[in-house]
Amino acid sequence: MAELRALVAVKRVIDYAVKIRVKPDRTGVVTDGVKHSMNPFCEIAVEEAVRLKEKKLVKEVIAVSCGPAQCQETIRTALAMGADRGIHVEVPPAEAERLGPLQVARVLAKLAEKEKVDLVLLGKQAIDDDCNQTGQMTAGFLDWPQGTFASQVTLEGDKLKVEREIDGGLETLRLKLPAVVTADLRLNEPRYATLPNIMKAKKKKIEVIKPGDLGVDLTSKLSVISVEDPPQRTAGVKVETTEDLVAKLKEIGRI
């Protein structure tokens, strides 16, 4: 079992602590000069892959990111956490803004085949678009079994036991490898990269390739019509009686 190899997808997103601003032309959100970091769910996926390696269940952990040159910073973070090497699928910034789950899933599927990995790990969703689609699409392209929203992952021989929380209970899946797993928040607590590991990460290899090298066309089939801030909420009012409530609702045109 020590010969297993894992591919972990990591996405560069606007940091969760940053207040999002919409562009004046409403074509997207402002990203220039804004702090970015690794998607929190991706951090959990990296942590799980590294833990499997520390248990000698996985031989190699490969971190991959698809996007502009700055994505290499995100890959370096994964390398500092314990990934062995990185792959950067370089996409120009303007094109990267239009990347959707379908295009990224095509890239991940091709890389999984090229690298002959046994396990693809990724966050269940990204905090920027909240799509929750990439893992499922990747499994579909590869025709591999999938375990989504994983809260616990255990290797049992040639199968992967995945526990996932569902409404009213816990569901257990046993996936025959190779497989795709998406990480839930409850899967683990990601480690902080230590300074020595950050320094070591600078010496680890990051291979830079183009989507065309994988035979993938990243042309999006979707177009964004408009991006807008949510409407401002108005302050509520207190009423003393049911009659006052009915009168107020009539006043604002709700009844």
UniProtKB/Swiss-Prot annotation:
The modification Phosphoserine is found at S223, S226. The modification N-acetylalanine is found at A2. One of its GO terms (molecular function) is nucleotide binding. Heterodimeric electron transfer flavoprotein that accepts electrons from several mitochondrial dehydrogenases, including acyl-CoA dehydrogenases, glutaryl-CoA and sarcosine dehydrogenase. It transfers the electrons to the main mitochondrial respiratory chain via ETF-ubiquinone oxidoreductase. Required for normal mitochondrial fatty acid oxidation and normal amino acid metabolism. ETFB binds an AMP molecule that probably has a purely structural role. The recognition loop recognizes a hydrophobic patch at the surface of interacting dehydrogenases and acts as a static anchor at the interface. The modification N6-acetyllysine is found at K200, K210, K238, K248. The modification N6-methyllysine is found at K200. Residues 183-205 are annotated as: Recognition loop. It comes from Pongo abelii (Sumatran orangutan). The modification N6,N6,N6-trimethyllysine is found at K200, K203. It holds the Pfam family ETF. Heterodimer composed of ETFA and ETFB. Identified in a complex that contains ETFA, ETFB and ETFRF1. Interacts with ACADM. One of its GO terms (biological process) is fatty acid beta-oxidation using acyl-CoA dehydrogenase. The gene is ETFB. This is Electron transfer flavoprotein subunit beta. The keyword Electron transport applies. It comes from the Eukaryota.
